[in-house]
Amino acid sequence: MNLNEMITEKEAVEYIKEKRKIFANSKQISAKNLNSNTLSVNGYANNLFLIKDENNNKVVLKQVLSYVRKAALENVEIPLPKKRIYSEFYSLKFWRNTCPGYVPEVYLFDDNNNIIIFEYIEKMFLLRSALIRRKRFENIDDKIASFLAKTAFYSSKYFLKEKEFNRLSNFFNKSDTINVWDDLIFIRAVLKPENRSINPFIKDKILEYRQDQKIIRKTKEIRSIFKNKKISLMHGDFHSSNIFVDENKIKIFDTEFAGFGLPSFDMGRLIGNLFLNYSSLLGMDYNVHRKKYQKYILKFVSNMYNSFKDKFSKLIYRKADLSFMNLEEYFSEYLYQTLSFISLTIISRLYDEGLCLDLKKIENIEKRTIAQEFAIIISKEIFYNNKKIKDIEELINMVILPQKG
């Protein structure tokens, strides 16, 4: 772990001037470190800079590190594969073709120095920030569904010829993404969570969750599927802090953990984070606006999931060979996997070092405990019933019922 490899603001400016491909005619170039100004894990794991010139043209420079930057500064080493820079660049290239306008433009890719330079996204909210502020958007759920459906289809055998599919999957299989998430979602969250700090008021409940033999069995079951089944490209780190939104569009970023695996992983990760926001509202003082916003979140989840099914089905019917496709079986397995990943995502974001901002912003520990306890309850209920729930409305009702009780 070499902290000296992290470039400084001055070195970032010198790098831009040396390349001259970007801001070629600019006379004044400045850099501002963004590492403490982001709600995304992007700024925790990597070295980020906002670069701008005298005409207020802006780009983001990202230096990909071989360890989690924030942890390293605290003298804790959490290694990360440097090759993920290839996953980021080539996944964005894929999405620019299949989902134009949904991902940022890439202006420079320098694999020798582990640097990638992107479009700077302005005048948009991180979805997590928007949820915390209780903002509402009309079409965002549909746009996210479109991104997920197109990814699940255009990178799968339903669209690609076998040779193309194998080439794409073999490339992304080199990224080590599956092992990264195996460690974070399965091992460190449930199976072997060694030395994990957590809110002491929920420590016993988390321990009970982790020692539950049914939970352990179900975790091992979905883990085996996750590690061995390769269906399509997945973003990997698909949660509400990696999606920019406004009234009319979305921008999805931080794709360095893109890999080949289960498309349900992205859906499960995002819904899990949405349910964490729903849970966090229980840590707030009760009022009618809180209740209405919880309903909005559940409607968002329902609309997004149903829209995904509709869009994916249309792609299959219009462009796929249906002779080897059973759509009903596909969605049944997809839902089971999604439910499992929702549960595991929720638990993984309750530990102190991974605590999502939705919960972290509840400063009163007793009120935060109420929200976290609810999150544990729904995680367990969903996991217990991951093969019984038949549609998204059953899931929504399951989230509502514990609160009523």
Predicted features and spans:
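Conserved structural core of kinase catalytic domains
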Residues: 105-143
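A glycine-centered beta->alpha junction motif in the catalytic cores
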Residues: 64-71, 120-134, 153, 276, ...
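Short, flexible/disordered intra-domain loops and linkers
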Residues: 68-83, 282-296, 360-368
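Active-site activation/catalytic loop segments of kinase-like enzymes and analogous catalytic loops
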Residues: 264-319, 342-360
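ATP-dependent phospho-/nucleotidyl transfer catalytic cores
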Residues: 128-143, 147, 157-235
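Active-site acidic catalytic loop and adjacent metal/ATP-binding pocket
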Residues: 38-55, 59-60, 219-265
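ATP/Mg2+ or Mg2+-diphosphate-binding catalytic cores
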Residues: 327-405
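Conserved NTP-binding catalytic cores of kinases and kinase-like/nucleotidyltransferase enzymes
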Residues: 1-114, 393-405
